[in-house]
Structure formats: C-alpha cells, structure tokens
Amino acid sequence: MRILFLIAFMYGCVHSYVNAVETKCPNLAIVTSSGEFHCSGCVERMPGFSYMYWLANDMKSDEDTKFIEHLGGGIKEDETVRTTDGGITTLRKVLHVTDTNKFAHYRFTCVLITLDGVSKKNIWLK
C-alpha cells in the first residue's frame, strides 16, 4: 500500500510540474539599432538551465549555420546578461555587426534554450 501511495504521490508532483505552461513570459524579441541587434527572452522556471546565443547563415552559399565566434572579424556578440524581477529571469544578448558589407546577405538567429524547449527568432541586415 505504501508503494502505491508513493507512486500516486510522485505522479501527482511530477505530472503537474511537467505540464506547467509559461504564461508570463513573452516570446523572443529583437530590437535593432545602428549595427546592433538586441535579443531578449524570459524564463520562469529554473533559469540556470537556460542559454541564449546567436547563429548566422550566409543565404548566398550552401554553408551550414555557424556560431558567431566562427565568422571572423566584423561581428561579435556580448555575454548574456541575466536580470531577475518577480521570479522571472530575462536573458539579453547583443549582436554587434561592424562590417555590414561582409554580412549583408546573412540571416541572424537568436536562440533561447529553456527547460520548456527552444525559441528562435530570425533577422536580416537587408
């Protein structure tokens, strides 16, 4: 009987946690300014397991999508900044594009990975 109770108790605890829905956090947002892309997204549960990064894909070639640090000069990303307010953690990461000619035909993707899944948002220079 104890085992049955323990199984029922654990199912109730885990089931409600697994099926929780993030409702207070909006989707990813990208704000542009001169040569910069500001990406932000938020996490309600266990933000220490969340990660944000930028990817780039040259739309004029058959190359795979690359991490920003593999593109060489003319582009860089800042460290992810985390702020917490009211139990919600917001992650922000800025992408700086200084060589707009080199990256004119690139698609940039901001990626936020949380325990709830992966969110992506794309943006182009032109």
Curated annotation (Swiss-Prot):
Task: Provide the protein's localization.
Answer: Secreted
Name the Pfam families on file: Pox_vIL-18BP (PF05566)
Q: Which keywords belong to this entry?
A: Early protein, Host-virus interaction, Secreted, Signal, Viral immunoevasion
Write down the Gene3D superfamilies for this protein, in alphabetical order: Immunoglobulins
Signal sequence span is 1-16
What Gene Ontology cellular component terms go with this record?
A: extracellular region
Q: What does this protein do?
A: Soluble IL18-binding protein that may modulate the host antiviral response.
Tell me its family.
Answer: Belongs to the orthopoxvirus OPG022 family.
* Protein's recorded name: Interleukin-18-binding protein
| Provenance organism | Monkeypox virus
Q: What gene is this protein translated from?
A: OPG022
